[in-house]
């Protein structure tokens, strides 16, 4: 029988932890404030990102923080990078803004490298600036470092459920900058044997079939994409595999979610499985809160005193 890897406990516990730190920070006049930039005007991406941002914003407000959402997706394509850079420079200078998320994926015409290079690493909640990416190449501290939210959330779920990745054959399907790439690097740092599959990989199924752990982070459900669609089904995995589903998109016409993993068939063979609703999404949201508290302390140490440490 499958064991469901649920995110509710991690999410609730992190919210309580974050509330306690918000109270401590408020005693010295600092309130966590998250700024989120939305730049992608693709209908599917925009609808999906709006859902995610709404949930993140609710979490931040529930712990006592503040949120500012900047909708830049209506700017003309030729001006969108420039307007985003101007806003990022302003947010970097504002001491009341303690964390920034540039919501990914970005449209192809936006200069992603320029945006993340411009963002202050001190306020980088998603850990995607060049300086913060380097942290993954050395030993990282899952509890204390600002790390990519979804990969760190997945590793926290593994820790909570006692899933050891050392020496395991792990397949990561998807090589995106937000999940696939950083997660693969983090898993290698934890001594897993990692294979990364993507749209150009030949014969993906044999790799998936022999994997001890399969992490699907594609986000191209067949219902919404005719070009390179992806869905993980039960016949593709071995008996007893651990399966983590990350990818999901919202149909802007019906408002329905569609996911990477066929939950019903995979549950018949997997030993552990994240539910499409209430699994990795909650773990990611928990990590957003944890990272925001970390970046807020970094801002507070610069503005007030380097002696203001977390406890």
Swiss-Prot record:
It holds the Pfam family THF_DHG_CYH. Disulfide bonds: none annotated. The keyword Ligase does not apply. It catalyses: (6R)-5,10-methylene-5,6,7,8-tetrahydrofolate + NADP(+) = (6R)-5,10-methenyltetrahydrofolate + NADPH; (6R)-5,10-methenyltetrahydrofolate + H2O = (6R)-10-formyltetrahydrofolate + H(+). Pathway: One-carbon metabolism; tetrahydrofolate interconversion. Its EC number is 1.5.1.5, 3.5.4.9. Catalyzes the oxidation of 5,10-methylenetetrahydrofolate to 5,10-methenyltetrahydrofolate and then the hydrolysis of 5,10-methenyltetrahydrofolate to 10-formyltetrahydrofolate. Belongs to the tetrahydrofolate dehydrogenase/cyclohydrolase family. This is Bifunctional protein FolD. It comes from Pyrobaculum aerophilum (strain ATCC 51768 / DSM 7523 / JCM 9630 / CIP 104966 / NBRC 100827 / IM2). The gene is folD.
């Amino acid at each position: 029988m499958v064991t469901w890897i649920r995110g509710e406990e991690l999410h609730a516990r992190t919210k309580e932890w974050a509330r306690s730190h918000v109270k401590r920070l408020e005693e010295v006049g600092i309130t966590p404030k998250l700024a989120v930039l939305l730049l992608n005007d693709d209908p599917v991406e925009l609808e999906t990102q709006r859902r995610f941002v709404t949930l993140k914003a609710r979490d931040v407000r529930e712990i006592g923080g503040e949120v500012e959402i900047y909708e830049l997706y209506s700017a003309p394509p030729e001006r969108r990078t420039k307007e985003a850079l101007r806003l990022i420079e302003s947010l970097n200078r504002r001491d009341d803004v303690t964390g920034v998320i540039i919501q990914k994926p970005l449209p192809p015409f936006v200069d992603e490298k320029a945006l993340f290079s411009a963002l202050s690493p001190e306020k980088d909640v998603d850990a995607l600036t060049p300086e913060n990416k380097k942290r993954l190449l050395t030993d990282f501290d899952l509890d204390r470092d600002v790390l990519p939210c979804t990969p760190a959330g997945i590793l926290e779920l593994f820790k909570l459920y006692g899933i050891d990745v050392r020496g395991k054959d792990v397949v990561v399907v998807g090589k995106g900058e937000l999940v696939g790439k950083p997660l693969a690097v983090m898993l290698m740092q934890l001594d897993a044997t990692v294979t990364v599959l993507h749209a150009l990989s030949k014969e993906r199924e044999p790799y998936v079939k022999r994997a001890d752990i399969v992490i699907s982070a594609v986000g191209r459900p067949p219902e919404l994409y005719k070009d390179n669609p992806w869905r993980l089904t039960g016949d593709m995995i071995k008996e007893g595999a651990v399966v983590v589903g990350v990818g999901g998109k919202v149909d802007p016409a019906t408002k329905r979610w569609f996911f990477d993993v066929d939950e019903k068939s995979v549950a018949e063979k997997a030993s552990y499985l994240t539910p499409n609703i209430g699994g990795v999404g909650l773990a990611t949201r928990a990590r957003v809160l944890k990272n925001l508290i970390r970046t807020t302390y970094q801002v507070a140490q610069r503005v007030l005193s380097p002696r203001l440490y977390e406890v």
